[in-house]
Amino acid sequence: MKILLILACVIACACGERYCAMKSDTDLSCRNSTASDCESCFNGGDLIWHLANWNFSWSIILIVFITVLQYGRPQFSWFVYGIKMLIMWLLWPVVLALTIFNAYSEYQVSRYVMFGFSIAGAIVTFVLWIMYFVRSIQLYRRTKSWWSFNPETKAILCVSALGRSYVLPLEGVPTGVTLTLLSGNLYAEGFKIAGGMNIDNLPKYVMVALPSRTIVYTLVGKKLKASSATGWAYYVKSKAGDYSTEARTDNLSEQEKLLHMV
């Protein structure tokens, strides 16, 4: 509260009689010697009045918001991660609704400059929202994975093994991909993506799907121990194109599967 009062004093010095601060807890007169008492002075400045009455509530909201952003990752908590995704999905429509409402309110009071800025903000928000959906649908078309609609997903790693496709969302395109096999469990980027595998099940190539293209990574080296189903395999970029990442179960060669177009 003292910080808010100091802030109010600074604003009072800059803005004259609209904002003020109390001389003491008992004296309700303003420090800048205005005729009105501090209650009317605070009410006259909406921002200061709001901070003075809602600062604790906003601090709790911001603490929760920071916690969700900081620890909203699957390796920490799936629950917090789900809340983070919900917030990110709701931000676009909420911001769009706020800009439209602000445009309406500014038009009602004939503030046409702010009305223009509000309309521009609404258009930009809507375009960015549509771009998100377009990119997500393009990525889903390649991978058939709901991770495509994750706002943080820039690419999806696709590994075909045992007749199935295993996917992992990525925040960027890697230079190389390492698959680690530990006691029959397959790991990529530190995450377990499959179980019950042996060295013969490791694929000859993996793919990283982007909205615009699919990058193929070919196996270039591996070190495996058959007795314990443990080892690693390393893949590097070999080609890129409009390839499908779906696992094929029909009688196709590896090259034919690779050239299967979306």
Curated annotation (Swiss-Prot):
Main localization of the protein?
virion
Topology check: give the Virion surface ranges. 18-47, 99-112
User: One GO MF term, please?
Assistant: structural constituent of virion
Task: Specify where the region named Interaction with N protein lies, as residue ranges.
Answer: 237-252
Q: Does the keyword Transferase apply?
A: no
The protein's superkingdom reads Viruses
The residues that the database entry marks as glycosylated are N32
Does the keyword Glycoprotein feature in the UniProt annotation? yes
- Provide the protein's localization: Virion membrane; Host Golgi apparatus membrane
* The entry's keywords: Glycoprotein, Host Golgi apparatus, Host membrane, Membrane, Transmembrane, Transmembrane helix, Viral envelope protein, Viral matrix protein, Virion
Q: What's a Pfam family in this record?
A: CoV_M
GO CC, alphabetical = host cell cytoplasm; host cell Golgi membrane; membrane; viral envelope; virion membrane
Q: Where are the transmembrane segments?
A: 48-68, 78-98, 113-133
User: Could you tell me which InterPro entries the record lists for this protein?
Assistant: ALPHA_CORONA_M, M_CoV
What the protein does comes down to: Component of the viral envelope that plays a central role in virus morphogenesis and assembly via its interactions with other viral proteins.
How does the annotation summarize its subunit structure? Homomultimer. Interacts with envelope E protein in the budding compartment of the host cell, which is located between endoplasmic reticulum and the Golgi complex. Forms a complex with HE and S proteins. Interacts with nucleocapsid N protein. This interaction probably participates in RNA packaging into the virus.
Family to which the UniProt record says this protein belongs: Belongs to the alphacoronaviruses M protein family.
Q: What is this protein called?
A: Membrane protein
The organism is Porcine transmissible gastroenteritis coronavirus (strain Purdue) (TGEV)
